[in-house]
Design a protein with these regions (language model features):
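Hydrophobic (often cysteine-bearing) scaffold residues that line and stabilize catalytic clefts
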Residues: 15, 19, 82, 86, ...
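Beta-strand/loop nucleic-acid-binding surfaces
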Residues: 290-307
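A non-catalytic, helix-rich entry segment at domain boundaries
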Residues: 26-120
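Nuclease catalytic cores
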Residues: 1-35, 51, 246
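Polybasic (Lys/Arg-rich)
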Residues: 213-245
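Short, structured interface segments
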Residues: 239-257
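Structural detector for short beta-strands of small beta-barrel domains
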Residues: 261-288
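Mg2+/Mn2+-dependent nuclease catalytic core
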Residues: 112-221
Length: 307
């Protein structure tokens, strides 16, 4: 999976990813936009402005989605989810300054400028001094005390996916700690640094705790330097049985599903097919399911047709 991801192959577009990108970009726009024309005590301006910014990003993502050859169907009814996720992000920004429950139509120009000033970095690049490890951090916020003095930094990573039930997933916790540790390595005199996953669906914050992960990250980097030939595959339910952008170029998932009897079994499953008939007027088609003929992924028609 990793080797294929480094070969410059086209990714498959996904509705969840497009929604997440639109929400992320709209929040960044809200934090970076010049609102000097908004008076300090002026309220009622943010909801309409925020939705307009989100709509612009939504349409951008829709255009990119439709220009992607490998894509499912765009779901316009997900717009309401995008609005809810953006509002969740704004609620967490309000929480950062102690007014979480404030109705968003009561946000004043002065309050939003205060939040903007606490945003030290928005969509910033994180990279170790040797250039080997890097990442994109959504927000670096200043932590202040009751006197308004800067006492720390907060790495906040916006998440539009499913909210954790009890704790952060191991990989997400590791990702957030790597952001923290790169930041500390590059800024040895930094104040206290903490990191959180900000889940926009329900505006909940989840702290990442644990030891420094840079040594492990360097070991992983060394082990995954791209090679001319693919690495040994890790075949199993956690890879071949789940979501993967690279199935179109990998024979292993297909053979794995065929061998364990799960090929063509579920309502939502990937398949290799022959297109036997296609009506361009109606979009209807007749497909013939294929099975792997060998370990290299050569397709063998089964005679089973679906329309």
């Amino acid at each position: 999976m990793y080797w294929l991801s480094r070969q410059g192959l086209p990714r498959k577009a996904g509705m969840a990813a497009s929604l997440g990108t639109a929400v992320h970009a709209s929040v960044e726009d809200l934090l970076l936009h010049d609102i000097s024309h908004i008076k300090d005590a002026e309220s009622g301006w943010l909801p309409e402005f925020a939705e307009g910014v989100l709509k612009t990003r939504w349409e951008e993502e829709k255009a990119i989605f439709h220009a992607t050859p490998r894509r499912p169907q765009w779901k316009e009814d997900k717009w309401k989810d995008a609005v809810r996720n953006q509002r969740g992000a704004v609620m967490m920004l309000l929480d950062h300054v102690g007014v979480r429950s404030l109705e968003q139509d009561r946000i004043t120009g002065a309050l939003w400028r205060r939040i903007q000033k606490l945003a030290i970095a928005v969509e910033g690049e994180l990279k170790t001094s040797d250039g080997r490890l890097m990442g994109r951090l959504d927000l670096l916020m200043g932590d202040i005390n009751d006197e308004g003095e800067l006492v720390g930094w907060l790495v906040a990573d916006l998440k539009t996916g499913r909210t954790p039930e009890t704790e952060l997933k191991t990989d997400v916790n590791r990702q957030l700690r790597m952001y923290r540790d790169i930041l500390l390595a590059n800024n040895p005199s930094a104040p206290n640094v903490r990191t959180e996953g900000w889940y926009t669906q329900n505006a909940s914050k989840w702290a990442a705790h644990g030891e420094n992960v840079l040594e492990q990250a360097y070991d992983a980097w060394q082990a995954t330097v791209p090679t001319p030939l693919p690495m040994e595959p890790t075949i199993g339910d956690s890879s071949c049985g789940g979501f993967c952008d690279w199935k179109a170029w990998c024979p292993h998932w297909w053979n794995w599903r065929n061998d364990n009897g799960t090929l063509h079994k579920s309502d939502f499953s990937d398949a290799v097919v022959l297109l036997q008939e296609y009506d361009s007027n109606t979009g209807s088609a007749v497909l013939e399911l294929c099975e792997p003929a060998d370990a290299n992924g050569r397709a063998m028609p089964t005679g089973i047709r679906q329309s």
